[in-house]
């Protein structure tokens, strides 16, 4: 299975196409049946990002959802958006792209003040790490803007190597937002980094949920590691996918029609430090 995955991956890398495509499709996360919380607010964000900084006009989009419960917050790929966001090669099961944040799940425990992150597609098993909450140190500005009918206020912060401009609304008094961006006196509805390589914008806010949405713990088996190690693995994987295949499969993939000893793919992570 892994060998087939990497041969498919390499064929994508070597192929010449006019459109961007996912180079590392992985299966979606699976979740336990027993919930850890019930969502009282659901926010869907559209994330636009540039996978290759050398081709800034080629942007990709993903829909991700933020589920807020009394104790837990979960940020993940939007299950309802699968029809638009997934790739499903002929003869295969459901796949999601590794690029961006689709292959990651973030669960924040507001009581303990820590976040657990799960990442698929970079090791034989899923990897996970836990970190103490370290929200951006926001500088709140006086400027306001109307977004989705809400009056939003501007804030700026440097965080994990990028400088962000966020717009939050105190009309929804929850100190949350997309990905790891939180800590403002209101929900973040829009946020963009200074290079416009990553942009999040809320496209749906549901507070009176017609159907109960549970926040479920991740079921997949995982290896516990650190954020630094995960970022190093991701960087190395993109730098040399042949060696990455050897690590995961136990032997180096053979590429028909190519004598290349190293094959690299573009890598523009949201975390730069």
Per-segment meaning from a language model:
Residues 22-273:
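Extended soluble regions of mature proteins
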Residues 1-31:
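Bacterial Sec-dependent N-terminal signal peptides
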